[in-house]
Amino acid sequence: MAAEVKTVIKPLGDRVVVKRIEEEPKTKGGIVLPDTAKEKPQKGKVIAVGTGRVLENGQRVPLEVKEGDIVVFAKYGGTEIEIDGEEYVILSERDLLAVLQ
């Protein structure tokens, strides 16, 4: 029996891979929302980070976020991908709006 190999995601340059954090599927009034009515969350956990942005002089600037950070990102930023049945978003650092602490 062959062992299952898990795919490793390694973003390039100033990109990060984020796994969305799903919010409670209820409104403040207690109404349960169906999946079709929910917006995708704009908050997630950083799974992997690239090596950083390269300046014109060749110097590499490391990213301000690290693996494990919880971030808020732009609503329409990034590229959604599915790997090993899990959904992720690949974002440029400029699409990250804040780190939650």
UniProtKB/Swiss-Prot annotation:
Q: Which UniProt keywords apply?
A: Chaperone, Cytoplasm
Similarity remark: Belongs to the GroES chaperonin family.
Role of this protein: Together with the chaperonin GroEL, plays an essential role in assisting protein folding. The GroEL-GroES system forms a nano-cage that allows encapsulation of the non-native substrate proteins and provides a physical environment optimized to promote and accelerate protein folding. GroES binds to the apical surface of the GroEL ring, thereby capping the opening of the GroEL channel.
Cellular component per GO, a single term: cytoplasm
Q: Which HAMAP family match?
A: CH10 (MF_00580)
| Family matches, as InterPro entries | Chaperonin_GroES, Chaperonin_GroES_sf, Chaprnonin_Cpn10_CS, GroES-like_sf
Give one GO biological process term. Answer: chaperone cofactor-dependent protein refolding
Name of the molecule in the record? Co-chaperonin GroES
Originating gene? groES
Source species, domain of life:
Bacteria
Quaternary structure and partners: Heptamer of 7 subunits arranged in a ring. Interacts with the chaperonin GroEL.
Q: Which Gene3D superfamilies match?
A: GroES chaperonin (2.30.33.40)
- Spell out the SMART domains in the cross-references: Cpn10 (SM00883)
CDD domains according to UniProt: cpn10 (cd00320)
List the Pfam families hit by this protein, alphabetically: Cpn10
Q: Where in the cell is it found?
A: Cytoplasm
